[in-house]
Amino acid sequence: MRTLTVHYLGQIAYTAAWDIQRQLAAERSRGQIGDTLLLLEHPPTITLGNKARPDHVLASPAELAARGVAVVQSDRGGEVTYHAPGQLVAYPIFKLSQHGSDVGRYVRGLEESVIRVLAGYGLVGERVAGLTGVWVRNGAAKICAIGVKLSASGVTTHGLALNVDPDLSGFDLIVPCGITDRSVTSLAFELGQAPALAEVAERLIAQIGEVFALEPRVEALAM
């Protein structure tokens, strides 16, 4: 079984994590490293994917500045989303040819990993036809957003954001993923208490390893 190298980055600015992803993706493309997984949190940040509409950012620049919320135009797929402490972010740097060479299948694998994590907490995670991510309560509320990019050399960047215990009011600043008729939720809200982020991270690592047939190994990141 191939190794999955896992790096914990703690809380890190979106742009700084993006720089790290690009460097690791270049190394993965050249075969200098194997499949890699970054786990982290972001400070309050709104990101716009390549399908995002600017008017789906509902707050004014002045309001966002007053609340300390950064806004970043990203090169990931998808629309507008919100990041904040208490949200577990996972960025896989994978050579897709080793996982079926199909972006849709890869995204379904990320969804499956999260669905299995939720099952461990007694929650039923679901897919919604025509939408990306993981949902609960029969598709009424989104608990995990997914947006990825595939490079010309077939290496993935960006990934998933699982709401463990973020301040959900931040999602009121946007139209999350361009969807107006469904809400956003978290593990803390659904369970009535927040599991430790480190515990959720360990479970997510294990499930990504199982779904993608990789053996996780946690290492410090040397850049």
UniProtKB/Swiss-Prot annotation:
Pfam families: LplA-B_cat. Residues 31-216 form the BPL/LPL catalytic domain. Its EC number is 2.3.1.181. Gene3D superfamilies: Bira Bifunctional Protein, Domain 2 (3.30.930.10). The record marks K142 as: Lowers pKa of active site Cys. GO terms for molecular function: lipoyl(octanoyl) transferase activity. It is found in: Cytoplasm. The active site is at C177. It catalyses: octanoyl-[ACP] + L-lysyl-[protein] = N(6)-octanoyl-L-lysyl-[protein] + holo-[ACP] + H(+). Substrate binds at R76, G77, G78, E79, V80, T81, Y82, H83, A145, I146, G147, G159, L160, A161. The keyword Coiled coil does not apply. Pathway: Protein modification; protein lipoylation via endogenous pathway; protein N(6)-(lipoyl)lysine from octanoyl-[acyl-carrier-protein]: step 1/2. GO terms for biological process: protein modification process. Signal peptide: none annotated. InterPro entries: aa-tRNA-synth_II/BPL/LPL, BPL_LPL_catalytic, Octanoyltransferase, Octanoyltransferase_CS. It comes from the Bacteria. PROSITE patterns: BPL_LPL_CATALYTIC (PS51733), LIPB (PS01313). Keywords: Acyltransferase, Cytoplasm, Transferase. GO terms for cellular component: cytoplasm. In the reaction, the free carboxyl group of octanoic acid is attached via an amide linkage to the epsilon-amino group of a specific lysine residue of lipoyl domains of lipoate-dependent enzymes. Catalyzes the transfer of endogenously produced octanoic acid from octanoyl-acyl-carrier-protein onto the lipoyl domains of lipoate-dependent enzymes. Lipoyl-ACP can also act as a substrate although octanoyl-ACP is likely to be the physiological substrate. NCBIfam families: lipB, PRK14345.1. Belongs to the LipB family. This is Octanoyltransferase. It comes from Chloroflexus aurantiacus (strain ATCC 29366 / DSM 635 / J-10-fl).
